Amino acid sequence: MDDDVVSISNLQRQILYSEAEVGMPKAIQAKKRLEALNSSIQINAYPNRLTTENAAGIISQYDIVVDGCDNFATRYLINDICIEQKKPYVYGAICGFEGQVSVFNYGNQKKNYRDLYPDEEEMQRMPPPPKGVMGVT
């Protein structure tokens, strides 16, 4: 799920895309690339933004949610819907050479993203990371 289009500045760190896809929807191009690698997989691409209006309906279709988004508002939204729907939430984030990954709301473990970052307003006020995330994965 991504409402953005491929830009030339993505290419050094987002390996699903090439110059040929610049200007095209990221979600659709990622789906095409992954299906070209393995034709037996099923991918549902959502070339739009996750919102309070569509999140519950989309998340309800899946058993587990894996999140690699780049903003706190979306992380809190995913977290809250996963709690509501009793879905495990796998969270991943990167800034520079530092990364985080965690699993929330799994089995009897009731810890969630808000336990890790309880102050949503404070997180929203944090400055964005500097440009130039290194593509070292």
Task: Indicate where each model-derived feature is located.
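Adenine nucleotide-associated cytosolic modules
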Residues: M1-T137
